Each structure stands twice: as C-alpha cells, then as structure tokens.
Amino acid sequence: MKVLLRLPALLASLTLLQMAASTRNATRTATIRETVDEVKVQVNKAFLDSRDRLKTDMSNLAPTVRHLSGYLKQAKGRTRTAIRVGQVWEQSLKRLRRMVPLTNVTGQGLDLTSLSWEVGCGHPAPTVTCNISNPYRTITGDCNNRKNPELGSANRALARWLPAEYEDGLSLPFGWTPGKTRNGFPLPQPRDVSNQVLDYLNEEEILDQNRSLLFMQWGQIVDHDLDFAPETEMGSDNYSKAQCDELCIQGDNCFPIMFPKGDPKLKTQGKCLPFFRAGFVCPTSPYQSLAREQINALTSFMDASMVYGSEPSLANRLRNLSSPLGLMAVNEEVSDHGRPLLPFVNVKPSPCEVINRTAGVPCFLAGDSRASEQILLATSHTLFLREHNRLARELSRLNPQWDGEKLYQEARRIMGALIQIITFRDYLPILLGDELQKWIPPYQGYKETVDPRISNVFTFAFRFGHLEVPSTVSRLDENYQPWGSEPELPLHKLFFNTWRVVKDGGIDPLVRGLLAKKAKLAHQDKMMTGELRNMLFQPNHTVHGFDLAAINIQRCRDHGQPGYNSWRAFCGLSQPKTLEELSAVLRNEVLAKKLMDLYGTPDNIDIWLGAIAEPLVRRGRVGPLLTCLLGQQFQRIRDGDRFWWENPGVFTEKQRDSLQKMSFSRLVCDNTGINKVPLNPFQPNSYPHSFVDCSAIEKLDLTPWASVKK
C-alpha cells in the first residue's frame, strides 16, 4: 500500500526531471544555434570580402606575389563551401568551449552532433546515391567503393596515417606560440632552415645524368591528379589578408614566415613572407578526434582529374557540349600552328595577363586550377587535351552509333589508363629503384577493404620533386638545337607565362626540352634551386618571390605533421637520437650537424626536410623513408580503385593488351609537330642518339573498342 501511495509522487518527480532535462536540452540547442548563426555571419562576410579584395588586387598595376599565390590557391565551388563550413565548425566549437563554464551549455560535454547539424557539416557533400550499373567513374570520385561510396571522393579530409600533432591539440601549429617548445626544444624559423640547409648557387647545380626533365614534370602531373589543399580565408572580417601580408601580424589563419636577421629579403620584402593556412573540413562522427583535418579538393584516384576536373560544374564547362563527338572545349581565339590550345579562363584579369600586360594573354582553363602555374605544366595539359579529342574522334569513327556522352566517357577512361600505365610502368620504377617490389608488389586485383585516400603525409612526401627542378628551361628546334632568340629561360620567368605558348613558339620547343634535357639531381649539398627558394612566382624584377622550401616547412606545421622520427618509426626504420646516429642515417656528418644545431633533436625535424635529406636508395631518386611513404600510397591508390585499368571488367583483355602500347613518346607523336622522339623519354637523350622516327613508336590500336557494348 505504501508503494502505491508513493507512486504518484515518484511519477511527478520523474515528470519534473524530464521537464528540466528537456528545458536544459532546449537551452543547449538554442545556445548552439545562436552561436553558430553569429559565426556564420562573420565567416561568410570574411569569405566574401576576401574574394572581392583579391579581384581588386589583381586589377592593380603591380600585384604582389601574395596576390598571385592567392589566386592559385583559392578554393572554388564545392571546395570553397566545404572549407567555409569547416571554418564555421571550428570557430563555433571554440566559442562554445569558452562558454561552457558560464552557461553549462552542454553539461558533461559539447553536443557535437547538434553542433554539426547546425553548422551544416553534411551539406557540402550530401549523402551519395550510387548507380551500381554505371560503368564509368563519377567526376567527384564518389561510388568507387560500393560499401563506402564517399571513400576517395573530392572535398573530404586527407587521411591520417599517424594522429595530428598540434600545439594545442586542436588546431594551432607548433611554432605558433613564442617560446613554446616541442620535445624540449624551440622550433627554428622555416626561412632560417632554408637559408642554412637548402641554399646553393645556381651555377653549382648538378644535373641528373640518368633522368630527363620529363621525370620531374611527370611527378608534378601525377601530384596534380591526386591532391590539392587550397588556402582557407581569414575567419574574421576584422582581420584581413592584407594585414598578414603587409604587417606580418600572426593571427586567425595567418601564420607568417619571418625573415631571420641578416636575410637579404629584409631589404626588399619587409619582415616576412605571408603564409595562409590550408583549408580544412568538419570532423566526422563519432568525433574520435577534433583536430583540424586539411581538405583534399581532388579525387584520390589516378583518374586524370587534372584534365577533367573533380566537380561536375567544372567538368561540364571543360566540355564542348555542342559537339556530338564527346570533345573537350578548345581555345576559339588562338591556336598553336593549327593545333588546339586550352581555353582561356573567364576571370579578368588573370595572373597571366598581369605578368605581361602588353601580351595580354590570359591563363588557361583546365581540370586543375594550377595548370598555368608554370609553362611546362601548361604544355602537359595541352597534350592531354589534344589526346582526349584525338581519342574521341577515332572512337566515333569506329562507333558512329555512339553518342557524345559515351564517346567522352570512353576517351576519359582511356586517358585515366594512360596516366596509370605511364606512372606505374615508367615512372615509379626509376623513382623507387630497388625498393619498388618491396612496397608495390605485382597487381592482385581490386580490394574493397583498401583505403585509397591520399594521406596527409603524402602531400609532403611527394614534394621531393621540388629538388629535381632545374634553374632553367630549354626550348629546342626540330634538330633538338637551341630554338629562337631566347632558347634558355630562367625558371622564374616562366610562372603564369602562357604568352610564351600563345605568341612565342607554341608547345613543341618546350616538349623537346622535356625529352632531351636533364632534370636536376636531388643532392644533399645542393637541394633546391634559387629560382624556387628565392624567386617563386617572381615573374619580373618588380615582384619579389617566395621561398618554396620555407613554405614547405611551414606547411608541415600547419598540417600538424608528426616529426621525422615518428615517420621513421611508422616505416619500421631506426630513429636516430644523437648527432652520431643521425650522421649514420644521413651518411653526412655536416648535414646532420646543421640539422641538430637548428632543431636540437631529430624528433623535431619537419617531415619534408628530414625525408629529402636522406641518401637515395639504389637506382632510385628518394631515400628509405620516402620509398616507404610513397610506395604505400601508390599501392593503396592502385589496389583500392575499382576502376583501375587492370581490374577485370574495366577493359576487355584485348583492350588491356592494346593499352600497354601507350607511351609518352607516342603521346607526343600524335599531338605535336614533332616527328623524332626518344625510345625512353624518361632518361636524358642526346639527339640523334636514342631518337627514332615516330613511325617506329607503337600506336594505341583502338579496334578492340569497335562496337564494344558496356
């Protein structure tokens, strides 16, 4: 009876508790919503202001290197949306964390699910619905993995093979707070490291006697197919990029690279090189880590996305949709001796026009926004554009019943195979040398459980190629002799330099230079040419250049990269602790001492620098750590790709046999006026030795595609 009497009171108490809990939850939700709404207004305004300022700056008579770099690194379309939402998430999280003790907003912890919902973290990349009968890749990379359709798609976070390491555990990079140490030692300034470790005189440059300039350029092509992390914007309308650029004020997403005492750039460029942090995305449920994760704006697959784009809107803009032949759009204003060039961008003015206002030639439009960054890259993009259209026309001749969409998709699929085959057959063996089989064994077929995403550390590992860039680029005539009045041009004059292609010889002289000239040798004592270390994006004497080495080091910290020894441990390599041990690993006591004097401990050496400092493996062009990191990544790219060219069902057996005949030399023969090419374009060749007529180079036979039904 007593229990029955107490029951109404118990129910009343439970009701009151439920009402109180409901009220608290409503208060928390309202507080989260109010906070997010305030942050959205602030961030959206900052993003709009930043874009408007960049347009204004680019219209000025004398834009700075920051403006040129900002144009190159700006996020667009869905990428910009994803980065903006990521910024709203992070700033809202920081505000709410400060409010917790005052308002008890989230009780035991922040309601991250509600926060994610209010921010709109799922909106930039909505849930994917896949057509399982579609025989072609999506432009975005979605639906490659049927169990996890988003795996490897564009505008997702780069994968972490080791947890991020930030100064505050969340987003601040090491080196942000003055006086704060890492592993007991202060971090050196990136520019100081660059000056002391990577500097050498251009005239002392050592060229690679066994690798052509194409070896360097192919690496950049592959990189631009796999990853791109655009810069984020300032998160506050009270703090602009101009303040970062002109006043070197660190704050928000500005992380300037300060010049050390005595640096010659102090006289010409003020106190610093402006540096803006990479764009990042929202964390995902179950929120095991809230550390900042940088975006990959591209698909992680080797799918020729630098030709076709990673967003549907861009992909459509790159096509000639009025043609029934599945063609890519070409430039309707200019051509290269009757051969097509890439279309111009519709942004006015573009950096390429700013560089040479007299010539007035805009930048080129391609699947990757960096296509006009340097002239050899623009040349490569031009070859790929021409090859797609050649393939589409030939496929149409063989299959007149195919419509434009099928012709486009089939040509696109063959282009993806071209990139894959040249990379794995011709490029990686001479990059990884004797370590190739250890890290990339023979293909055993598609594995659904393999994660193909590009890792955060790969974006630094693949920057080894910066050490292979020579100080000059050569243009050669039909006899592979110096072409024109300026046959050899310093690299810094070829940034954003499309006018040289349009008005000064076209791409053929540049392609010959790729085939016949040598890459720079990555050498411990002569690491990076001054054209990149002091004159990056410096097109003329009125614009002072960036330091690519210092940028790479600062970017390691921006991305929260673990140090050198953490990655050595990841790869099963020894972890040197003393000068003697580091000297043994590097086989170079002088270099080891420089690094120890700068960093105090090998644990702190930035991963990019530590990796490129190692001696090269036998018959390769990277050291043991890089062979591990690069080898693992490329194996994952291959084995985790359902559309890999060797995977049964992607191509027929006869088609695969035909595809193996593709080569860079054949690409040149079919798409330029060049008729003499080397048998092995990745090794330096001295004309006429090792050169043959194009008739001796095997052609891709497309007859296996005749009337093939997919």
From Swiss-Prot:
The modification 3'-nitrotyrosine is found at Y480. PROSITE patterns: PEROXIDASE_3. Ca(2+) binds at D225, T299, F301, D303, S305. Expressed in the lacrimal gland with higher levels and 3-fold higher activity in adult females than males and secreted into tears (at protein level). GO terms for molecular function: heme binding; lactoperoxidase activity; metal ion binding; peroxidase activity; thiocyanate peroxidase activity. The modification Phosphoserine is found at S313. Residues 1-22 form the signal peptide. It is found in: Secreted; Cytoplasm. Glycans are attached at N25, N104, N131, N238, N320. Its cofactor is Ca(2+); heme b. The keyword Hydrolase does not apply. Its main location: secreted. The keyword Secreted applies. Its EC number is 1.11.1.7. Keywords: Antimicrobial, Calcium, Cytoplasm, Disulfide bond, Glycoprotein, Heme, Iron, Metal-binding, Nitration, Oxidoreductase, Peroxidase, Phosphoprotein, Secreted, Signal. It holds the Pfam family An_peroxidase. The record marks R370 as: Transition state stabilizer. GO terms for cellular component: basolateral plasma membrane; cytoplasm; extracellular space. It catalyses: 2 a phenolic donor + H2O2 = 2 a phenolic radical donor + 2 H2O; thiocyanate + H2O2 + H(+) = hypothiocyanous acid + H2O; iodide + H2O2 = hypoiodite + H2O. Induction: Repressed by the androgen dihydrotestosterone (DHT) and the estrogen estradiol (E2) (at protein level). Thiocyanate (SCN(-)) and hypothiocyanite (OSCN(-)) are bound in the distal heme cavity. The iodide ion (I(-)) occupies a position which is stabilized by the interactions with heme moiety, His-224, Arg-370 and Glu-373. Hydrogen peroxide is held between the heme iron and His-224. Belongs to the peroxidase family. XPO subfamily. This is Lactoperoxidase. It comes from Mesocricetus auratus (Golden hamster).
